Amino acid sequence: MDNVKLDGPADILVTLGLTLPSVSETELADIRAAAPPRSTVRVASTMKAAIETAGDVEVILGFIPKPLFDVAPKLRWVHCIAAGMDMFLYPEMQASSIVLTGEKGLVGGHLADTGFGLLLALTRQIATAIRLGPEGWNRREAMRMVEIELEGLTMGVVGFGGTGRAMARRAVAFGMDVIACDVVAGPPSDGVADVWSMNRLDELLAASDVVAVGAPLTAETRGLFDGRRFAAMKPGALFVNVTRGEIVDDRALVDALRIGHLGGAALDVAPIEPLPPDHPLWTFDNVVMTPHTAGASQRRGPRNIQRFCENLRRAQTGDALLGVVDKQLGY
């Protein structure tokens, strides 16, 4: 089921959390105006409060962890503010008739901003300069010797959805050549020379100076970047990941860095979060990391509320909802 019809008043719950820390009175008014007449719109400031009041809820804006799902028997539709849906696709949700919508097309830009920022911090020695502080002036010559220019290099994008396309646009703006792999091969777009099927992934890896992950976490992508994949990459290639850490075998990544096969890694995500202080990734000067912050933007909440309101209107007319997630595929 990929659509929902709201024929009468609905019980709507807005759950605040990491990706929707607050909702203004104006935004609540917009939700009430978009909802069917006489609908109830409530806000739960904590997940505990949401669980305690979810018995009659039909529509949720926010996260849907398993404990909330378990106490919401009337639930019909969830708009989940999450770039990746993997944590909410437990078997019971997948088997249910609940419609799940999300942020497709809304978050790729700021994820790519972080990805490209980390790439620049790595290639232009920005991270090294910040780490060294005043000592950087004494290391200036050594830093200049290893700076990398992006123009003319090839970026291979793995997963050509919203995040992958946004990375590609930024790479093209920096004068890079871009190729991509996706589960569905397609014609060139967003300045990309080719969009190949995933069975050509090794070919993409061998041709790329920078490999950027834009794929969601699914059964097919979990552990995709293992020792064999890293070995297939160009010697000295750079690796960028801002989507899900579990796509990468971190031991294989550490090994590829340790032997010098990889030139560096730019990461916003890790298989274990928080990444333990004694994890080997912290020991490499050619690894730059942020603590899973790429998904943040001051416009993220408002954009999702706008989509939610549009979908409330569509749910009353029977039109197709925006951002529907295929619960079996995971995106």
Regions found by a protein language model. Name each.
Residues 160-161:
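Glycine-rich Rossmann-fold phosphate-binding loop(s) that bind the pyrophosphate
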Residues 1-101, 226:
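An N-terminal-biased, well-structured beta-alpha scaffold segment characteristic
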Residues 164-165:
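N-terminal Rossmann-fold NAD(P) dinucleotide-binding loop
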Residues 183-280:
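Rossmann-like adenosine-cofactor binding region
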Residues 98-154, 321:
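Phosphate-binding beta-alpha-beta segment of Rossmann-like dinucleotide-binding domains, i.e.
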Residues 236-238, 242-331:
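Rossmann-like dinucleotide-binding domain for NAD(H)/NADP(H)
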Residues 51-54, 68-73, 88-95, 169, ...:
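Short loop/helix-cap segments at secondary-structure boundaries that form the rim of catalytic
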